[in-house]
C-alpha cells in the first residue's frame, strides 16, 4: 500500500444507489479507503515507523474530508436535510477508529492531525448523538447487531475523546442501557444468535470491545461478567464442525472464518472457551470491510492471550468437543456433532 494511490470517492458513485440500486461500486472504493486507514494505523501502532505515521496522517486527512461517513444505502437524502451526519455501522466504526488512533498515537501524530480527529469525530458522531433524545436512532433500541456495533463504537469513541465528567457519563450510561436492555435481550437464555454466526461475530465483537474499554475506565461496571454474556460467548464453538463447516441458519454461511482476536479474548475471560481449527481463523485480509475492531483486536487480543498462556495465567487453547448433542431451547436448534467433529 505504501506505493499505491488511495482511491477517491465521488458524488457519481454515491448517487448510484438512489438511481439504480447499485451500492457495491461505491462501497468498493469506500472500503478500499478503510483498508488504507486500518493498515497504516495498525502498522504505526506496532512498528512506529515515521513513514507509516506520515502516510497515516495523509489518510486521516482524506477520511476526514469525506462528505459522509455513512454508506450510500443507509442515508435518506430526500427525507433528512442532515443526511451527511447519518450514524450507521460504518460511520460509528470510522469515528471509533480515528478516536482510538488518536489515543494510541498521541505522542506521534501531529497537533494538526489530532485536532482534526477531535473536531470531525465530535461533529459527525458525538455531538449529534448527545443532542438527540434517546432512542433517536433505529439501532438504539434494536435487538440485533446494529445496536452492538453502533452503540459499542460510539461508547468507545466517547471513552477515548471526551473529558471525564457529567457529559461523558451521561453518554456512557445511555450506551450501557441500550446494550443491556436491547442487544443482550435479543438473545435467549441459551446464548444463540438467530441472526447467524457471522452476525454473532460482528455484533458481539463490537460489544466486547466496548465492554473492555468501559471496564478499563470503570472496573465496577463489567458487561463481560453478565451470565448471559458468557452464554453468548460459547455460541461460536457450538456452530463449528470439521473442515471449517458451520451452521448456516439465518444469514450464516456453510463455511466460515472466525475472528481469532475475539476468540482469544473470550478464552482469557472465561477459561473454558473452545477454539475451532486455527486454519479457519480469518486472516488480515479476510474482511472486505477492513473493520478496525477486528484487525486491531486480532493483533492485540491474540498477542495478550498467547502471552498469558506462556506465563501460565490461562490454559492452552482447547479444541472443539468431540461427539455431543447440543440443544438450544430458545432458538429451537438441535446440533449433533460426530466423533470427529462431523455434522450429523
Write out the residue ranges for each language-model feature.
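Low-complexity, Ser/Thr/Pro/Gly-enriched N-terminal "stalk/linker" regions
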Residues: 1-18
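Exposed boundary/loop context
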Residues: 14, 184, 189-191, 291, ...
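Low-complexity, intrinsically disordered regions enriched in charged/polar residues
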Residues: 7-11, 95, 115, 119, ...
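Aromatic-lined, polymer-binding surfaces characteristic
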Residues: 27-240, 246
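Carbohydrate-active enzyme catalytic cores, enriched for enzymes
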Residues: 204-344
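Short, functionally important structural connectors and interaction interfaces within domains
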Residues: 6-9, 185, 320-323
Amino acid at each position: 500500500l505504501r506505493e499505491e494511490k488511495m482511491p477517491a470517492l465521488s458524488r457519481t458513485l454515491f448517487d448510484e444507489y438512489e438511481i439504480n440500486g447499485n451500492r457495491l461500486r461505491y462501497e468498493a472504493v469506500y472500503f478500499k479507503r478503510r483498508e488504507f486507514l486500518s493498515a497504516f494505523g495498525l502498522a504505526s501502532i506496532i512498528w512506529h515507523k515515521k513513514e507509516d505515521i506520515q502516510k497515516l496522517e495523509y489518510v486521516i486527512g482524506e477520511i476526514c474530508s469525506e462528505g459522509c461517513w455513512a454508506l450510500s444505502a443507509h442515508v435518506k437524502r430526500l427525507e433528512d436535510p442532515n443526511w451527511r451526519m447519518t450514524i450507521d455501522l460504518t460511520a460509528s466504526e470510522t469515528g471509533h477508529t480515528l478516536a482510538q488512533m488518536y489515543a494510541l498515537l498521541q505522542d506521534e501524530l501531529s497537533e494538526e492531525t489530532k485536532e482534526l480527529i477531535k473536531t470531525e469525530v465530535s461533529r459527525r458522531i458525538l455531538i449529534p448523538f448527545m443532542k438527540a433524545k434517546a432512542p433517536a436512532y433505529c439501532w438504539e433500541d434494536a435487538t440485533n447487531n446494529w445496536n452492538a456495533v453502533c452503540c459499542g463504537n460510539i461508547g468507545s469513541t466517547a471513552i477515548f475523546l471526551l473529558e471525564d465528567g457529567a457529559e461523558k457519563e451521561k453518554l456512557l450510561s445511555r450506551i450501557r442501557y441500550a446494550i443491556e436492555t436491547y442487544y443482550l435481550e435479543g438473545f435467549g437464555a441459551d446464548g444463540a444468535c438467530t441472526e447467524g454466526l457471522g452476525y454473532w461475530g460482528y455484533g458481539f465483537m463490537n460489544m466486547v470491545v466496548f465492554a473492555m474499554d468501559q471496564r478499563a475506565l470503570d472496573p465496577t461496571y463489567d458487561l463481560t461478567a453478565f451470565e448471559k454474556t458468557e452464554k453468548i460467548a460459547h455460541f461460536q464453538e457450538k456452530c463449528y464442525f470439521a473442515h471449517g463447516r458451520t451452521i448456516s441458519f439465518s444469514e450464516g454461511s456453510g463455511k466460515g472464518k472466525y475472528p481469532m482476536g475475539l476468540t482469544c479474548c473470550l478464552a482469557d475471560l472465561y477459561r473454558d472457551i473452545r477454539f475451532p481449527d486455527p486454519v479457519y481463523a480469518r486472516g488480515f485480509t479476510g474482511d472486505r470491510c477492513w473493520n478496525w475492531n477486528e484487525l486491531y483486536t486480532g493483533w492485540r487480543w491474540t498477542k495478550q492471550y498467547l502471552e498469558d498462556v506462556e506465563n501460565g495465567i490461562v490454559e492452552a487453547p482447547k479444541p472443539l468437543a468431540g461427539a455431543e448433542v447440543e440443544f438450544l431451547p430458545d432458538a429451537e436448534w438441535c446440533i449433533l456433532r460426530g466423533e470427529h467433529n462431523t455434522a450429523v
